[in-house]
Structures are given as structure tokens and as C-alpha cells.
């Protein structure tokens, strides 16, 4: 039966369409690759053979609508790659800024913690810290972040309340009334990105 079907398929492809399809606009010279793939697909499906892989032209990939994403990859956990699943991937975890930190009880938050992180209000963190750049700068200068690569045991703890009192009672910074960047000779050839360029009378062509 299989040989009969295959020989019929060969004859059909060789001599063209059957008389019943003689009035079709297609001619034997104009049989497209898509028609052949459909025919082969139907024959293989009737024979119980696995479906053949249908490859589409590259320009059809541009017709996709909506967001497209690819999930998975050789870096996501233990996988077995290859056509038979016999190639294990071994990925070493790289250390860097993107590596999630271990926020356990011992080394989770820096010392001192950032103002009142979750669950740390009883450890003496300041609930009402001033929202100023000056306090933030001083706070970060005295902050001891937990860093196992640069963790020096000689660094002592500091008193947050003492720093707060120092910042509160310290001398206020004087405001500048004059912008130092607007002093001096102005550069006329510098044009802002969104402004219309201004040309002097010397640059204009005589009419």
C-alpha cells in the first residue's frame, strides 16, 4: 500500500494535475513549494509518520504581532542540551553586582542600617531622618556596608544619634545668590539643542 501511494505521488508530481483539476489556474510549471509541502504533509500524516518540519520564508517572520519573547537558555539552572538531551550544561555562578545578596540576620543590612528598613526600627534606626542631601552625604560617609571582599575588622561602629545631633546643630550652608556658571564672557557660538540657531549679520549672504 505504501509503495502504491508513493508511486502515485511520483506520477502525480511528474505529469501534473489530474483531469478533475484541469480547470485550476495552476499549471504543472507553477506548482509552488507550499503545495508540495502540503501534499507531503498529508501523505506522511496518512502513513502515520511524524509530521515533517515546515520551514517558512524569512519575510513571514516579520508578520508577527505583539511582544515576542524567548524563555529559557543555557544559563537557567541545570539542563541537558542537545538533540538527545545528553549534553549537561554546567554554569558557574559569577559574582558581581547582579548577584543577589544574602540578607540573613548576620550580614543582611549594612551597619548602620539605612533609615528604618523593615523590621529594624527597634535597633536604633532613625525614623524621622531629615530629607536633605547634606544629611544623606554624611550618612553615607559613615556607613559601613557589609562587603566580604573588603570587610576590615578595624572599622568601628558609630553613633547615629550623635551624627543626627551634629547635623542638626551645625552651621547652615550659605545660599549663593549668583550662579557662577553665568559669569564671564558668553559663548555665542554655543546653541541649545531645542533653540533656533541665531546667525549674526556678518554670516548672511549679501543680496
Swiss-Prot record:
Keyword Transport annotated: yes
GO cellular component: extracellular region; secretory granule
Keywords annotated in UniProt: Chaperone, Cleavage on pair of basic residues, Disulfide bond, Neuropeptide, Phosphoprotein, Secreted, Signal, Sulfation, Transport
UniProt organism field: Sus scrofa
Family statement: Belongs to the 7B2 family.
Disulfide bonds: 116-125
Main location: secreted
Post-translational modification as stated in the protein's UniProt record: Proteolytically cleaved in the Golgi by a furin-like convertase to generate bioactive peptides. Sulfated on tyrosine residues.
One Gene Ontology MF term: enzyme inhibitor activity
Compartments where found: Secreted
Assembly, per entry: Interacts with PCSK2/PC2 early in the secretory pathway. Dissociation occurs at later stages.
Protein name: Neuroendocrine protein 7B2
Residues with the Phosphoserine modification: 136, 200
GO biological process terms, semicolon-separated: intracellular protein transport; neuropeptide signaling pathway; peptide hormone processing; regulation of hormone secretion
Protein role: Acts as a molecular chaperone for PCSK2/PC2, preventing its premature activation in the regulated secretory pathway. Binds to inactive PCSK2 in the endoplasmic reticulum and facilitates its transport from there to later compartments of the secretory pathway where it is proteolytically matured and activated. Also required for cleavage of PCSK2 but does not appear to be involved in its folding. Plays a role in regulating pituitary hormone secretion. The C-terminal peptide inhibits PCSK2 in vitro.
Region (Disordered), start-end ranges: 168-207
One matching Pfam family: Secretogranin_V
Domain of life: Eukaryota
Signal peptide extent: 1-22
Amino acid at each position: 500500500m505504501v509503495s502504491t501511494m508513493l508511486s502515485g505521488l511520483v506520477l502525480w508530481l511528474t505529469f501534473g494535475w489530474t483531469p478533475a483539476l484541469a480547470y485550476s489556474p495552476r499549471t504543472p510549471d507553477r506548482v509552488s513549494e507550499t503545495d508540495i509541502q502540503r501534499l507531503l504533509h498529508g501523505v506522511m500524516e496518512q502513513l502515520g509518520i511524524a509530521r515533517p518540519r515546515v520551514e517558512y520564508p524569512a519575510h513571514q517572520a516579520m508578520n508577527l504581532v505583539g511582544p515576542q519573547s524567548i524563555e529559557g537558555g543555557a544559563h537557567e539552572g541545570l539542563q541537558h542540551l542537545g538533540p538527545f538531551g545528553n549534553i549537561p550544561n554546567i554554569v558557574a555562578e559569577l559574582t558581581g553586582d547582579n548577584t543577589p545578596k544574602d540578607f540573613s540576620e548576620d550580614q543582611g543590612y549594612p551597619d548602620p542600617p539605612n533609615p528604618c528598613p523593615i523590621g529594624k526600627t527597634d535597633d536604633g534606626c532613625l525614623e524621622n531622618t531629615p530629607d536633605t542631601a547634606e544629611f544623606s552625604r554624611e550618612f553615607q560617609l559613615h556607613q559601613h556596608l557589609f562587603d566580604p571582599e573588603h570587610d576590615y575588622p578595624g572599622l568601628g561602629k558609630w553613633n547615629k544619634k550623635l551624627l543626627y545631633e551634629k547635623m542638626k546643630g551645625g552651621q547652615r550652608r550659605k545660599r549663593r545668590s549668583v550662579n557662577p556658571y553665568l559669569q564671564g564672557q558668553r559663548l555665542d557660538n554655543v546653541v541649545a539643542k531645542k533653540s533656533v540657531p541665531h546667525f549674526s549679520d556678518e554670516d548672511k549672504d549679501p543680496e
